[in-house]
From Swiss-Prot:
Gene3D superfamilies: Diaminopimelate Epimerase, Chain A, domain 1. It is an enzyme of class 5 (isomerase). GO terms for molecular function: diaminopimelate epimerase activity. The record marks Y268 as: Important for dimerization. The keyword rRNA processing does not apply. Substrate binds at N11, Q44, N64, G74, N75, N157, N190, E208, R209, G218, S219. Its EC number is 5.1.1.7. It holds the Pfam family DAP_epimerase. It is found in: Cytoplasm. This is Diaminopimelate epimerase. The active site is at C73 (proton donor), C217 (proton acceptor). Belongs to the diaminopimelate epimerase family.
Amino acid sequence: MQFSKMHGLGNDFMVVDAVTQNVYFSPELIRRLADRHLGIGFDQLLIVEPPYDPDLDFHYRIFNADGSEVAQCGNGARCFARFVRLKGLTNKNEIRVSTQSGRMVLSITQDELVCVNMGEPNFEPQQIPFRANKAENIYLMRAAEQTVMCGVVSMGNPHCVLQVDNVKTAAVETLGPVLESHERFPERVNVGFMEVVHREHIRLRVYERGAGETQACGSGACAAVAVGIQQASLAEKVRVDLPGGSLHIAWKGPGHPLYMTGPATHVYDGFIHL
């Protein structure tokens, strides 16, 4: 099976063309391939499938390193767009794809960055899903023997965002796994730790559901900005600094889609016998 290794700001992926190849991945196989000592090593596996709708170009599937399938990955979406162009699967600059959670439009910019229309952030608890009586800008939760304040949103996948004074010293390793599997998130959650530098600049670390802390999380950056705008602490255009680099997020508010722009890097092509 042929594959490519790619990354978006250090969030790394194994990308597989299932348009021209017949492939099947069991959770056990994914876990073996994700192992950085015994396999390829990656945060997520991305699979390019033929479209299910004639109006679309491809279907986009995402699997975490633990073998679980998820509905969204923003950094992966940028790598997906770069991959299908590099492999000659399309020559379009605007690529329309379906995911488990809906549809996305991926646009290649003139300077070879990828702009992703991530759709409109969803703050409705039942659709995140998050156990709450009603939608709030800020929720109080008990975790790791303390009370934390957070915003909760879906970007096609669930996110919990905490504002911290200093992202370098944030309790990512202790609070991250506790909140990820908190009972109020029936499908678990990605946990973002956001430091607001000013209204157009934040620093962010993300503990990803099923993957742990990663170098960058695209949907997490989108979620942090959406929550920051909802809480009136951020402007419409924000630079997000992650451990692996920077993304640019733009959102005009409710009723509008959110856009994420950033790089996608091809590392190497490989072949593995399964």
